[in-house]
Amino acid sequence: MIPILYEDNHLLAVEKPANMPVQGDSSGDDDLLTLLKGYIKDKYNKPGDVYLGLVHRLDRPVGGAMVFARTSKAAARLSGQFSSHGAIKTYLAVAEGNAPGGELEGFILKDEATGSSALVPENTCGAKSARLTYAPIAYRKGRTLVRVSLHTGRHHQIRVQLAGAGYPLWGDQRYNRDARPGQQIALWA
C-alpha cells in the first residue's frame, strides 16, 4: 500500500516509492496514478472512472512526497502554483565528493531519443534555463548530504546539474559513471 501523507476532498498527498513510475509507461509496471485511483475508488465506493489530477512528476528512480488533485478545480490551482513557482520543491540527496553548496544555473536540453538530459550552452536550440540552490547538511566518507531547492523544474535537473558541478548523486545509474549496478539513487523529494 502507498503511504498516505494527507487527504481531503481536494488533495491527496502520498509517499511515492522509489523505482515506481508516476504514470503508466511501456514497461507495464504498476504505476502510482493507477494505484491511487484504485485506492480512491475502493475507499469511497466510486462507480466508473475516478478523477485524479497529476500536477507534478518525479523521476522513476526517485521517491518522496507527491501531491495529486482530486478535483479539476484543485488541479488548476495546484498546476498554477507549480508553474508560477509558488510550490516549494525541496529534496534531500547524497552527492559524491565534498559539495560546498551554492547556486547552480545553466541550460538543460532533453534528448527525447535517449531519455537523458544534458547541460548545454545558452544558445542551444530547445535548451531551457535551470536554477537550483543546494546546501550541505553533513559530510561523511567523501560524500555530502545536501538539501536541494529547485527554482525551475527541468527534466532530471538535480541529477544533471549536480553531476555537471562535479558532485553526481550516489547510485545514479544514468549520470554517475561510478555508480554500481543495483545501487539506489540517493534522492528523495
PLM regions and their residue ranges:
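RNA pseudouridine synthases
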Residues: 1-189
